[in-house]
């Protein structure tokens, strides 16, 4: 399976974040050099004890060597602890540098794909996979790996035969690592993909739990989720079987190799070609030389997860480049000018809005009507900047939407979607769009404009009522009003409402009309996607869409009159046809 090419822009961005910790990586490298040099303490102590202390029977020499070893091992422990702590800080810094960028990119990706929560969670999981690898002992094993030749060279210095045994053993472990990577890569990748699909399915079923219970679908949904989960588990078990098999082999082979080294050393001692101390020291040095390889084999799943996460992050960051540094623009007037607009929904090849043009002046409201599938919601998502423009332009105050900073644009536009989602937090937090420093006066004014103020005060804790605890007791109309209040916060230039009265009663519809009149009176513009005639009572203009195109546009009453006349002419023609025998 060939790995697809990694986009250059995203990879460069990741490498820059990694390079920001270059000095810390350099420190880890220096400390790793010190640790590996101090690792020679044990073998050299063994060599001196067997070859000098036992031969001379000198307690003073043994005491001096032992005190030196205690000091050197203490220093090794301090240095090893330092490099472990440094890698943890490198991992934390890497996360700090990229988490905001990844979060924003994943949100934009989710807005395009229609699933913000899943895209955001996936991007942050990939970043977490890379962070776990950077802070893991596996990374330290990579730093230790270049020092393996030093220990092998020391073994060769004792005797070439011992060096050959150690080299052959090392080559076998390296081949084991490469084979492990090749054979476990596909199952681990498939397991990750299948697990993600099962998790997305579980999240969807959780969110739709009320419908599932009401329609008696619990058994069916469990069966479908369990099938997806079983597939993920099957791939995970397959990958674990392969990886664990190589891990067990490498561990067992390393133990065997130590015995083989002792046997070869004993043979050379019998031939009086090496000393007993050299036999023991060479066995320890070989174990130290092969330890990083064995650690890489055992932690290969972590390496694979980090590599896959790195690749996915590179693609995500390439698809969603960072925001440009834009010149701040003054607050625009509500002059909305849409010219020859075409929009292609994400994941599709055909435009569902084609060549639509219209214009609004400050203080005007426009209704958009048409049958289901006419492109009303697509138009709404393009107007708020959530979906990109394929052709044509959308201008607000003379500037296209992409000339505004996204966060600034969000404060200039109020949006009420068909399905209102309230976030974890208080009602005030939701109305203030989760702002860290909300304006309480504007929150209350927005709620009053949406006729939600008294309704909120009637809740257990008023504006401080937490949505996560009470969302099950909020009706669709209450959620709709809170969503409308959020759309009116802080003071939008353009208000886009998609089926705003779908969950409102007569009182709520009247409150909606009052909110529309308020926005118009303040010089704003309002665009309403509607099915019900009551939703366009406050509209001066009317846009009729059919199959993604503009069928009619103009003053509301004139457009409605023309539609009635056209309908009457069609009916008259049909009746005349039937009278003449035409079928």
Give each language-model segment a name.
Residues 428-469, 514, 518, 561, ...:
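ABC ATPase nucleotide-binding domain helical subdomain, centered on the C-loop/LSGGQ "ABC signature"
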Residues 15, 19-22, 111, 122-134, ...:
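An intracellular "coupling" helix at the cytosolic face of ABC transporter transmembrane type-1 domains
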Residues 384:
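Helix-to-loop junction immediately C-terminal to a conserved catalytic motif
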Residues 65-72, 140-190, 263-274, 291:
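Transmembrane helices of ABC transporter permease
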Residues 88, 194, 217, 241, ...:
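Cytosolic ends of transmembrane helices, especially the final helix of ABC transmembrane type-1 domains
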Residues 1-40, 55, 59-64, 83, ...:
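Membrane-integrated ABC transporters
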Residues 25-82, 86, 156-161, 272-276:
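Transmembrane helix-loop-helix hairpins at lipid-water interfaces of multipass membrane proteins
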Residues 46, 105-150:
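Juxtamembrane loop-to-helix connectors within ABC transporter transmembrane domains
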